[in-house]
Amino acid sequence: MSVDIDTVKRVARLARIAVDEEDASRMTGELNAILGFVEQLNEVDVTGVEPMTSVIPTTMKMRVDEVTDGSKAEDIVANAPQTEEHFFLVPKVVE
């Protein structure tokens, strides 16, 4: 598969990215190089290779699940202009 300049412009338009003619031609070459590398990866025989998420088998460390208030209430409301009992006070906007 190869990418032409029209495809680059179309993808840029769909992504809402402004791309001028010079950048589009540069990106065409870069995308073709990336796709060439991916095609090389597709040629690798992975028959019998078990899928993995990490090179080294790891397990997540478990900790006790306990409920706390986070001890951050004062820090959270510290810069608020108005607070009351760790809640933000804001002007009423709906009658």
Curated annotation (Swiss-Prot):
InterPro entries: Asp/Glu-ADT_sf_sub_c, GatC. The keyword Cell inner membrane does not apply. GO terms for molecular function: asparaginyl-tRNA synthase (glutamine-hydrolyzing) activity; ATP binding; glutaminyl-tRNA synthase (glutamine-hydrolyzing) activity. Its EC number is 6.3.5.-. It is an enzyme of class 6 (ligase). Keywords: ATP-binding, Ligase, Nucleotide-binding, Protein biosynthesis. It catalyses: L-glutamyl-tRNA(Gln) + L-glutamine + ATP + H2O = L-glutaminyl-tRNA(Gln) + L-glutamate + ADP + phosphate + H(+); L-aspartyl-tRNA(Asn) + L-glutamine + ATP + H2O = L-asparaginyl-tRNA(Asn) + L-glutamate + ADP + phosphate + 2 H(+). One of its GO terms (biological process) is translation. Pfam families: GatC (PF02686). Allows the formation of correctly charged Asn-tRNA(Asn) or Gln-tRNA(Gln) through the transamidation of misacylated Asp-tRNA(Asn) or Glu-tRNA(Gln) in organisms which lack either or both of asparaginyl-tRNA or glutaminyl-tRNA synthetases. The reaction takes place in the presence of glutamine and ATP through an activated phospho-Asp-tRNA(Asn) or phospho-Glu-tRNA(Gln). HAMAP family: GatC (MF_00122). Heterotrimer of A, B and C subunits. Belongs to the GatC family. This is Aspartyl/glutamyl-tRNA(Asn/Gln) amidotransferase subunit C. The gene is gatC.
